[in-house]
């Protein structure tokens, strides 16, 4: 089956980007180099085409009640414009997807989901809506999305796109009319830096991209550095640090599962795991030597296999060899000594916190 293309696909090809399949789309992995693009976001500003992400709207009299039923975080007292991170769970606590939920109005919610999960999520959201007075619309084909990220992102939004965003704090959003098109701008991102995400029509997303490129103030970035950036910040990737087998408790994300809510799908399983403990846990590991721990590499403790690497890199920002790994929970205590098996050689490492880089968000 042919991969889908975003509304900016032609511009990426024209610019000579390295294109590869990701989440069912033909996406730019890098333009110049992953290191250059990573550093641009950490030091200045980078822009990503993230139009492959999915968008679903939930409206109707029971919209808030229904979103609360399928979402782990608590949206009960949400003001219009608030954005929440959380998960949708199966009854056993496995993760359907992790997502953002935007409250766009009274009983009007905007859900942003992972590209590879669009069809699965849309079906799951519809299947669980029986008995609720809601209208669920998959808008994934309508919206394009840009992520403008980095310490200079606010200046770029103002100076290049004419959008004043100083009123937005971290995890808030607003709707603006641009060229007669309703556009959502939020102060969110997946890089560990300050930044904004823009959801609009394909036509406006193409126009905004051209303006950003023309300005010279914003480097085009591919999904290669999006992964190195999110990894350094300790942010999970669905399929690696979260999955239908890796629960929020195992991933260290149970703070986004509000057990004081009356109910949500999977609540009982999460409460049970928190009370009884877990056998596996996602941990951070820093190697003592320069070697690159890759996804799937074996982690051992005193020669005994205890798990596998979920994501690993030589950190571009710190130059340290670090990884996240799903390992035996009893071995995951900070300071514990483990080994990662890389090309038939054992490299010693220490269990550390999963955030390998200090995040810079505007609170």
Descriptions of predicted regions:
Residues 1-86, 94-96:
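Acidic, proline/glycine-enriched N-terminal capping motif
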